């Protein structure tokens, strides 16, 4: 286990289900200290609404970390600017959301925390406040000074990484270059080894076009870009299979051998993974100088404060982060 034995959590949008799920996480023992970067009053009020017992302890960075006991959380206080009503967005609290992300990220960068787990945010309301925000992945990459990070979603049975993330489909072909594939695949291979404990990961790669281009008859990106890039990376010792047509690759005879699949764009790979394991999937940012996992769902405003939100994805994200910490220290 990591020396500091602490994991920092950002609940995300205060009006969404993030605070509910954090309160639910607190209902069991954990082998690490859970430091929640949030408004203490928000956490206590949401726990009261859900009729969940919760005691808060103020984060003391100079004290040794302690395993988290059921019914308790450690809190790193950040105040909301306006009162929070479950289910009702308030643009005035957008700066609060960004502040929690910044503080948690900085704590990971300076070694306070072994990992960061994020709850869902509402990108629209943050941008409405005049704060440019594409997403967690891009925010943490920029704050960490990383030129390239990789988005990967994982269930127990399948890991899918993305060569491109939040781009319009029209922009995807131009964003896939030999250089970008080199960077993405090197990060993917490195983190599968160091954070997932895989000695020689097998990475299966999707083509961009239908039928992986059909020998150039349905697009030349495979011939001109993807195949040469994969050949160059194979020469470095990375195990790569493909490019294969996506509708072929996502079949058991291939997936049973795959440690990870690299999809060329967001909606090529993620629908399959989410159909297979929605609510059990974890979003992981590879290439950061720290471990970051997240839930695979949104803010679910209509469920906030009702007691009906499922904490399964949050628990899975936390358990995976703990496993990754152990792998990094072996």
Swiss-Prot record:
Pathway: Cofactor biosynthesis; pyridoxine 5'-phosphate biosynthesis; pyridoxine 5'-phosphate from D-erythrose 4-phosphate: step 4/5. InterPro entries: PdxA (IPR037510), PdxA_fam (IPR005255). Its cofactor is Zn(2+); Mg(2+); Co(2+). One of its GO terms (cellular component) is cytoplasm. Binds 1 divalent metal cation per subunit. Can use ions such as Zn(2+), Mg(2+) or Co(2+). It catalyses: 4-(phosphooxy)-L-threonine + NAD(+) = 3-amino-2-oxopropyl phosphate + CO2 + NADH. A divalent metal cation binds at residues 166, 211, 266. Keywords: Cobalt, Cytoplasm, Magnesium, Metal-binding, NAD, NADP, Oxidoreductase, Pyridoxine biosynthesis, Zinc. Its EC number is 1.1.1.262. GO terms for molecular function: 4-hydroxythreonine-4-phosphate dehydrogenase activity; cobalt ion binding; magnesium ion binding; NAD binding; zinc ion binding. It comes from the Bacteria. It is found in: Cytoplasm. Substrate binds at residues 136-137, 274, 283, 292. The active site is located at the dimer interface. Homodimer. Catalyzes the NAD(P)-dependent oxidation of 4-(phosphooxy)-L-threonine (HTP) into 2-amino-3-oxo-4-(phosphooxy)butyric acid which spontaneously decarboxylates to form 3-amino-2-oxopropyl phosphate (AHAP). Belongs to the PdxA family. This is 4-hydroxythreonine-4-phosphate dehydrogenase. The gene is pdxA.
